[in-house]
């Protein structure tokens, strides 16, 4: 064996021995009461940092949405400005006069010998069949929004919460329209959805309107991410919905 190979082998063995010594010393450190207290404090600080990172992530998402909205507004204002400038430069020198027509004719203008035409009443239309009403989630009021703790709503706005309620109502209406639809008129896709809806019902949801995350993905553009679940916490706080769990599913019941 060459001397260089022997030196490399010795170096490798010494490195392994050093790693073992460090591991043993760290394990022994973890058993000391004073160091346990320090490790517990570090664990608590890591939890706090994780919460701050979650809030920071929500703040970044909010700022991105605000930035996109401002860009759209700026583009819209530029278009409006161009239209106004075009109108300003192309105003005609003479505008047509508006002619006023009298809707009622005075009695003195009528010819007494001319027979008066009596209009026949239109046939009464049959009222449409009553459609089964679907319960929707009421929007959040300003007072309710102000009553939500600041740590819960973070940077979320009043309009953002009500926009989510609008999307949830869209999912509820789409789901229960299928459930109220005659089975004969269903295609294969609708029939599969119908059977899924029936399978998801339990004795606790009987007679109540509810959706699951799959309905959110099926009927809306919402994403079931951290922000969505923060919004659900706010809706639970405002008593707009409750949860029924079972069979690996969380059912969001409209209250």
Swiss-Prot record:
Source superkingdom: Eukaryota
Outcome recorded upon mutating residue 155 to A: Decreases microtubule binding
CDD domains assigned: SKA1_N
Posttranslational mods: Phosphorylated by AURKB at Thr-157 and Ser-242 which negatively regulates the association of the SKA complex with kinetochores to allow correction of aberrant kinetochore-microtubule interactions and promote mitotic sister chromatid biorientation.
Spans annotated as Binds microtubules and protein phosphatase PP1 subunit PPP1CA: 132-255
Biased composition regions of type Basic and acidic residues, renumbered to the chain: 114-131
General function of this protein: Component of the SKA complex, a microtubule plus end-binding complex of the outer kinetochore that stabilizes spindle microtubule-kinetochore attachments, promotes alignment of chromosomes at the mitotic spindle equator (chromosome congression) and assists suppression of the spindle assembly checkpoint. Kinetochores, consisting of a centromere-associated inner segment and a microtubule-contacting outer segment, play a crucial role in chromosome segregation by mediating the physical connection between centromeric DNA and spindle microtubules.
Gene that produces this protein: SKA1
InterPro entries: SKA1, SKA1_MBD_sf
Annotated source species: Homo sapiens (Human)
Location of the region described as Flexiple loop that anchors MAPRE1 in the Swiss-Prot/TrEMBL record: 92-132
Motif SXLP motif per record, residues: 93-96
UniProt name for this protein: SKA complex subunit 1
Residues the record lists as N-acetylalanine modifications: 2
Molecular-function GO term, any one: microtubule binding
Protein family membership: Belongs to the SKA1 family.
Modified residues (Phosphoserine): 242
Keyword tags: Acetylation, Cell cycle, Cell division, Centromere, Chromosome, Coiled coil, Cytoplasm, Cytoskeleton, Kinetochore, Microtubule, Mitosis, Phosphoprotein
Subcellular location: Cytoplasm, Cytoskeleton, Spindle; Chromosome, Centromere, Kinetochore; Cytoplasm, Cytoskeleton, Microtubule organizing center, Centrosome
Gene Ontology BP term (one): positive regulation of microtubule polymerization
Coiled coil: 49-91
Subunit structure: Component of the SKA complex, composed of SKA1, SKA2 and SKA3. The SKA complex is a homodimer organized around a central W-shaped coiled-coil structure, formed by the interacting domains of SKA1, SKA2, and SKA3, each end of the 'W' is extended further by the C-terminal microtubule-binding domains of SKA1 and SKA3; the complex forms extended structures on microtubules. Interacts (via SXLP motif) with MAPRE1 (via C-terminus); the interaction is direct and stabilizes the kinetochore-microtubule attachment of the SKA1 complex.
GO cellular component terms, A-Z: centriolar satellite; centrosome; ciliary basal body; cilium; cytosol; intercellular bridge; kinetochore; microtubule cytoskeleton
Region described as Disordered: spans on this chain: 106-131
Phosphothreonine: modified positions: 157
